[in-house]
């Protein structure tokens, strides 16, 4: 699953101040929720200045600031995130077996992530675990992950692998339809559709025996595009209307030279052409060549 990552020149990346400026424009247009993701957002130098600035917008146009992280730096940031106004985070965790976790993450330290989760809970953050379901890799851990999450009072969301970006290993070999996973879980647990709605693509179910909740993100078996109200902004200022399309506008230069009006015009163009649905197909070529780390999960 190795990805050949290439770092960008600093001048091509939005400064933290520019990110705040862009956020203010988006909030003025009606955006009520901002999610910081990656890559790994906590790896950005000075990221807490951005978090603090956005946290000050909560209650002044912004309803919620949330974060998706791989958890490797979470232990040192959890308290500061809560102090800045973050109340919910997602942690990507595809395995709780150290050797397997290291393989999936290409050398990651599982204990470091688990300490981060503990620190987040101690700081008062609500934590949801995101687990990509991978056939022949971690499918034997799904039930135990659900039980662990229930014991830790964490929600769990399972995600189908997506044909996105160029990778060295064929994703088709590891595609695991979540309707299959759901049927397996229903052999042991009672799953009742939840009334919880987060505005995201996940469909939630209450797990009665565990008094917990599980979500399913199914871009392939059950297309979720009809309810999409999201755009994705890369660190370069490129804005994508859809995770599974290359439809985009470039805001960096407009932000630096033209200001809010120029940015608004580009956003209007993007939203007018927002695709009705993605083009993900298992067995086909990747819908887009960019890595998930460019736009986040």
Outline where the language-model segments fall:
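Auxiliary Fe-S-binding modules of radical SAM enzymes
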Residues: 147-151, 158-297
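Canonical Radical SAM [4Fe-4S] cluster-binding loop centered on the CxxxCxxC motif
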Residues: 1-14
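Short, solvent-exposed loop/turn segments at secondary-structure junctions
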Residues: 8, 75, 165-166
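Short, small-residue-rich loop/turn micro-motifs
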Residues: 1-4, 93-95, 160, 243
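Radical SAM/AdoMet-radical enzyme domain recognition
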Residues: 13-36, 44-159
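Short histidine/acidic/glycine/proline-rich micro-motifs that form metal-
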Residues: 41, 132-136, 163-171
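Short, flexible helix/strand-to-coil boundary loops that buttress conserved ligand/catalytic motifs
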Residues: 1, 78, 105, 243, ...
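Active-site catalytic pocket residues across diverse enzymes, especially alpha/beta-hydrolases
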Residues: 4, 58, 255
């Amino acid at each position: 699953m190795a990805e050949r990552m290439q770092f960008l020149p600093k001048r091509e990346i939005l400064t933290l101040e520019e990110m705040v400026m862009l956020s203010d424009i988006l909030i003025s247009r009606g955006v009520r929720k901002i999610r910081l993701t990656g890559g790994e957002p906590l790896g950005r130098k000075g990221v807490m200045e951005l978090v603090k600035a956005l946290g000050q917008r909560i209650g002044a146009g912004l309803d919620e600031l949330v974060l998706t992280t791989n958890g490797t730096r979470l232990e040192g940031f959890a308290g500061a995130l809560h102090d800045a106004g973050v109340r919910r985070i997602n942690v990507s965790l595809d395995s709780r077996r150290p050797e397997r976790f290291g393989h999936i993450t290409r050398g990651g330290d599982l204990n470091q992530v688990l300490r981060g989760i503990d620190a987040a809970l101690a700081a008062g953050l609500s934590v949801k675990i995101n687990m990509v379901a991978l056939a022949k890799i971690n499918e034997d851990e799904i039930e135990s992950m659900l039980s662990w999450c229930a014991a830790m009072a964490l929600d769990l969301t399972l995600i189908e692998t997506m044909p996105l970006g160029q990778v060295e290993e064929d994703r088709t070999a590891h595609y695991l339809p979540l309707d299959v996973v759901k049927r397996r879980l229903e052999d042991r647990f009672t799953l009742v559709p939840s009334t919880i709605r987060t505005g995201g693509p996940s469909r939630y179910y209450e797990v009665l025996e565990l008094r917990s909740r599980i979500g399913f993100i199914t871009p392939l078996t059950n297309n979720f595009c009809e309810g999409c109200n999201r755009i994705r902004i890369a660190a370069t200022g490129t804005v994508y209307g859809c995770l599974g399309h290359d439809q985009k506008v470039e805001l960096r230069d407009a932000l630096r030279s033209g200001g809010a009006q120029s940015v608004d015009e580009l956003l209007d163009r993007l939203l007018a052409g927002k695709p009705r649905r993605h083009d993900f197909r298992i067995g086909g070529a990747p819908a887009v060549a960019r890595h998930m780390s460019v736009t986040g999960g």
